[in-house]
Amino acid sequence: MTNIPAELAYTAEHEWVQDLSEDSTFKVGITDHAQSELGEVVFVQLPEVGDTVTAGDVVGEIESTKSVSDLFAPVTGEIVSVNDELADNPGLLNEAPYEAGWLFTVRVESQDATAQLLDAQAYQQLLD
């Protein structure tokens, strides 16, 4: 069964978003379902710190032994940090997609930046 933490928000593109409760900053990663479908992740291309991203835009890609998949911005804002550990160990996405395998953090300007995201129950229904 797919792990879907209740405290996170989700996108239909199988990304999760965590409110870090500091300066309107959110941490972003891919879901357990996504990493399972991708198979062994071998390379991750992330956005650059300082990039301005728009929700729904392609901001990078994830390459696995099965395919190459686009990485989408779940919210609009500025990239504050990226997970540099993924350059040397992209398999963290498979091992710990909600912890060590996070992708990037983004600072949003709008208070309702996450209004379009799914809660855990809605994401589970999407998968069913």
Swiss-Prot record:
Any one Gene Ontology cellular component term annotated for this protein: cytosol
Transmembrane helix listed as a keyword: no
ATP-binding keyword on record: no
UniProt cross-references to Pfam families, sorted A to Z: GCV_H (PF01597)
Biological process according to GO: glycine decarboxylation via glycine cleavage system
Record's cofactor remark: Binds 1 lipoyl cofactor covalently.
Domain Lipoyl-binding: 25-107
InterPro entries xrefs: 2-oxoA_DH_lipoyl-BS, Biotin_lipoyl, GCV_H, GCV_H/Fam206, GCV_H_sub, Single_hybrid_motif
List of residues that carry N6-lipoyllysine: 66
UniProt superkingdom: Bacteria
Protein family according to the UniProt entry: Belongs to the GcvH family.
Function recorded in the entry: The glycine cleavage system catalyzes the degradation of glycine. The H protein shuttles the methylamine group of glycine from the P protein to the T protein.
PANTHER family: GLYCINE CLEAVAGE SYSTEM H PROTEIN (PTHR11715), GLYCINE CLEAVAGE SYSTEM H PROTEIN-RELATED (PTHR11715:SF3)
Assembly and oligomerization: The glycine cleavage system is composed of four proteins: P, T, L and H.
Protein name in UniProt: Glycine cleavage system H protein
